[in-house]
């Protein structure tokens, strides 16, 4: 999406999107993609400025990309491990642009530690951010979506929800709790899709596969055995965009691998970059 500019009459004109974990990687790419189609995007993460994280990328960077392309976006710094911060995020997002039409649950905190030594505090933190954080934000945005009989919720999952990376020997050591979190999110998404179907709200989960992001680099998940599986962040962003713009009566309750989804619907990777 290098050099992309906003389509003033895009398919998301008039929509408000809230994207968590939007300071880098998948979240940043999703925020930019939605903004390119006219959505007003609220970006949130813990890192707003350089020097606040060991990883590259900030909310300020994401907002600059969007605004430089002619889009509308703002950021709200928040720690999604805290309920009061999630509530403040929702209030400030609505104050900025109005009720949320699209919620993208992408925020995550991840520790790869063998299960026999996994600390309870870190387990609780992962569940709080990835699982309960997504549920709580959904609780906050749902009343507005129900009132308008319209909305889309997308959660970022992982193939680890089903099994670790193959071959098993030496692959993704300590990823059991991460996989548990993602499995919980997938079951949550399919269950919620059933609950809100009559309200014209779609709920789906996207499994990105291995993606070239700063977080993946830190955990050293890309090596000579896995490099052929790596997808660009633009694929995931495009899959999210395609999902939130389709008929919610037909496109809901799905768990899709991003690249396979794009192929199924006739969108090729070459069209995304």
Region annotations inferred by a language model:
Residues 34, 99, 186-211, 249-256:
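Conserved Rossmann-fold SDR core element
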Residues 154-198, 210:
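Catalytic loop of short-chain dehydrogenase/reductase
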Residues 138-139, 190:
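A short, exposed helix-loop element centered on a Lys and neighboring polar residues
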Residues 183, 198, 205, 223-273:
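C-terminal helical subdomain
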Residues 114-115, 119-124, 174:
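Substrate-binding pocket helix/loop in short-chain dehydrogenase/reductase
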Residues 15, 71-72, 99-100, 145-159, ...:
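Active-site loop of short-chain dehydrogenase/reductase
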Residues 2-97, 111, 121:
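Short-chain dehydrogenase/reductase
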């Amino acid at each position: 999406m290098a050099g992309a500019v906003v389509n003033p009459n895009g398919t998301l004109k008039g929509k408000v999107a809230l994207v968590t974990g939007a300071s880098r990687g998948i979240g940043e790419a999703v925020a930019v993609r939605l903004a390119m189609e006219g959505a007003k995007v609220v970006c949130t993460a813990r890192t707003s400025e350089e020097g606040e994280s060991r990883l590259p990328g900030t909310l300020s960077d994401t907002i600059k990309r969007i605004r430089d392309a002619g889009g509308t976006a703002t950021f709200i710094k928040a720690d999604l491990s805290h309920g009061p911060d999630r509530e403040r995020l929702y209030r400030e997002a609505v104050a900025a642009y109005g009720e949320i039409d699209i919620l993208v649950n992408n925020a995550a905190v991840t520790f790869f530690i063998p299960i026999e030594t996994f600390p309870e505090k870190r387990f609780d933190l992962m569940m709080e951010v990835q699982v309960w954080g997504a549920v709580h934000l959904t609780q906050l945005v749902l009343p507005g979506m129900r009132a308008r009989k319209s909305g889309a919720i997308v959660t970022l999952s992982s193939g680890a929800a089903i099994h670790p990376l193959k071959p098993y020997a030496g692959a993704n050591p300590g990823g059991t709790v991460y996989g548990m979190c993602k499995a919980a999110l997938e079951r949550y998404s399919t269950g919620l899709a059933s609950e809100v179907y009559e309200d014209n709200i779609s709920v789906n989960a996207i499994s990105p596969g291995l993606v070239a992001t700063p977080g993946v680099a830190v955990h050293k998940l890309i090596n000579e055995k896995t490099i052929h599986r790596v997808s660009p962040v633009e694929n995931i962003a495009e899959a999210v965009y395609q999902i939130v713009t389709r008929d919610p009566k037909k496109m809901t309750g799905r768990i899709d691998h991003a690249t396979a989804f794009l192929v199924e619907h006739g969108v090729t990777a070459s069209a995304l970059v």
